[in-house]
Amino acid sequence: RVQRGDNDVEVEVFDGSEIGRLQVGFNRMMEESAERRVLRELFGQHVGEDVARRALQFGTELGGETRFVAVLFVDMVGSTATASERPPGDVVVLLNEFFRVVVDVIDKHHGFVNKFMGDAALAIFGAPLDRPDAPTAALAAARDLRFALNDITGLDIGIGVSAGLAVAGNIGAKERFEYTVIGDPVNEASRLTELAKLRPGRVLASTSAVYFASDEEQEHWELGDQVQLRGRRRLTHLAWPVERP
């Protein structure tokens, strides 16, 4: 049973002989194995399965590496007003449903939900696992996410997508750190999300993300105007999804 992956095994201890001591040792080993399994599962829930797997394989040293990634940022509109107008319990229910949909859609497109920030979520494609089609996956996820979130009553959102080089790795102090991505694509996606809240479709992407996407995915996007996003020197050329019939 253990060989088949069944860790819920306990042998009966018959006596205090050598065989009995071996039986006690086996049971203790299986208890520790079960505890490690639970810890791995909890670790994966907190940081994501890919990050947990990477940490177990390569360790948790601080530092990062340059990766080509696509970043998707999604944020609720008017969350402050929502929190003041609804009972706290209702707000928690709304947030949990919002994040559940976000995780489901991002997982479907093989992305990594890096963090929840209040009423927003940051998703990464291309780290910690390489993805040559990261922009394609992020753009497709953005389109699907917009429609999936439409089903949640009382929820309005903005979604931004960008792509480019960023530093991905364990950032923080030795005592406390997190796996995250830092760089221009993250900043641009965040600013695009702010602007998307003011646009009818609620979804915006940089044309750099669209440029690196597959031909099939590009057909779902329309190129638009150039804008000066807050905190950025160069202009960002916008793109948004083609309206579905």
Q: What would you call each of these model-derived segments?
A:
Residues 15-22, 65, 91, 135, ...:
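The cytosolic transmitter module of two-component sensor histidine kinases
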Residues 33-113, 117:
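Juxtacatalytic helix/coil linker segments
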Residues 1-2, 6-29, 36-37, 41, ...:
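HAMP signal relay modules and closely related sensory coiled-coil linkers
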Residues 166, 189, 195-245:
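Cytosolic regulatory/linker segments at or just downstream of nucleotide-handling modules
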Residues 74-77, 105-137, 149-186, 236-238:
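Catalytic core of nucleotidyl cyclases, primarily class III adenylyl/guanylyl cyclases
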Residues 91-98, 137-141, 145, 185-188:
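Hydrophobic alpha-helical membrane-association signature
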